[in-house]
Amino acid sequence: MRVLILVNERSGRGKAALLGAGVETALRQQGGEVLALRAAEATLEAIRAWGPRAIVVCGGDGTVHHLVQQAFGQGLEQWTVYHAPTGTENLFAREFGMWPRVLPDEIARRVLRDQSRLIDLGIAGERSFALMMSVGFDAAVVERVCAIRTGRITRWSYAKPILREATRPTLARMRVRIDGERIVDAHRGLLVVGNVRQYAARLNPTCNADPSDGLLDVTFMAASSAMEIIRWSALCWSRAQHAAVGCVMARGHEIEIESLEHEAAVQMDGESAGRLIPGKPGVIRVAPASMRVVQVSPRRA
């Protein structure tokens, strides 16, 4: 089997490079044909030229997101993806049972076993996401982090942006429709569109999402202050958000989001993804069975 290894050398203070080298050795020892590339230099043309059956991504969620951006609609579903996590949150790996500290020999066995499943993706204009997108406080924090980022990030990288955003939280007044039905009408709050259950700090606002059901899960939490954001964080942590006043949870094929007053930051898979412009609704659609991942184990929270 031909396997491509994509390595984000900035991830994990060099851990991704070490892990990638170990996986390359293990794959060769187990009979695989292997090509290793730096993720930053791996063009779609280079991937196609190698013609891999599987791709091992050594890095964080951003590295997986970059691959999805490159290859959605260009043959992504033909390659079985395994995430060898060395990032900050590693939500993709967590969702699909690709846990950290798995030895290179075991990663090689999982990949060469050639057992996979198809998952959905979310599409918003020219961008796509595997995990989630959101509008609100968290997206504004991500935007702040990306604006000052100079290298790898850790959880501490978010501390100052969170504090600064909390002093004057960006909570847009939104209108939201799912498959044509209005579920939020001119309320301020946080909106998450999830393809999977996982979210940063295990808050998991779309805790019932299934990445293979052909639908996207939506959670809206009404909020107009930093204290209400803290309250929602606590409710999500305890998996009690669904029963709280001000929470709307639904799912569908197409979600339309409109910011009514001012520009609102958007994030996808933990990466800044521009802004919603008043008067220009954003439309998010599900793309069923658009990505293939290594089948490891049943999902766990």
Predicted regions mapped to residue ranges:
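Short acidic/glycine-rich loop or secondary-structure boundary segments that cap or lie
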Residues: 138-141, 184-186, 199-202, 226-230
